[in-house]
């Protein structure tokens, strides 16, 4: 079995073998990020659309205060995990690093993107198999998750700095975000819209993981538990 060094496309003409794609630190990072994103989305939605009633006076129950506290904690945890992975703290094979730095200048890679799109649009009967993420998945993760994380992190940290006050170190570090966007009222909707981008990304990610596991030629769900990607012999004929 041969693996293309640029796209990681698998040539299974000579048989297949398991490929170790996700190291243990990457798998742990993946599930911790999932927990952080879930907490951010739930509490972020409640911040954007607060509950209209509660079981007592707000100064006694402190419900919204707890929601904000969980949101801030999850956001800071998410930020720490993102920075940790971005700078290689979680290690990872070349497959795990690729969606952070996809080969955007490679025509071979872009052909793989369009081939995958054609497959999902039922314009071709099959698509190549890849040791890591396919090129379209890499592009989606880079655009929606990596770039989206940059936006949601800087806007989130700016809004968090605002809660501390204008004469604080937090504002000294992140006050430039308000200057960049114009004011706080411009930052807030951008941050909120990114929540919906993350929701769409999560739904697509989960759906495609199940779909590829069932219809594709390689395991997807189990690989994030074991680290191994197995290829189906019958799928390759």
What function would you assign to each model-found segment?
Residues 1-237:
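Membrane-embedded alpha-helical bundles that constitute the cytochrome b-like, heme-associated redox core
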